[in-house]
């Protein structure tokens, strides 16, 4: 996948662990948001995040580590951040937030997929939008052409949109990012994020190989745009010649 699409960083494997057993070779993170743990994994690091180490209260609730603090549950927090102007809007956003049951998992293991020693539950990819569309197309092919839906609140893009939703609903979901992950990580303006159950990976890779034979390089070559540009330049040249001739 990385070679075909030219991903700038690696795709990330995510495992939900139901015990507190140490993960060999992985660094236990402290005072990290989930999006920051994902950032470190996409840059090649093998990391683990648990209830003690996760610093984002919204993500902590999403993974069933801790209840939402009162300020977020009532909506006051998002008003304070300047994200929404009405508490009832934020309250509704959190009320409808997909989440794991409290205590369902104990740890989250994130690692570069290319260095995987265990099968992940999920694969999360963060990169430029153009690169992600091919993954979505390959996934759609694996689903027999079924249109791909996205579920987002433009909040919790990595933890909920790209991890919890794919896990609970057993499908790909994508997001353009959110206030939190764009503030807390190196996510670039033109990047987005998606996640899908790892069981879909073989079919996605197979169709990416197929796309790479014709559709992908042809699209990136912008042949239709080049033809239009050439035609427009020809019209401009002809117009200039007529102007010079006094026609």
Region annotations inferred by a language model:
Residues 2-247:
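Acidic, serine/proline-rich low-complexity intrinsically disordered regions
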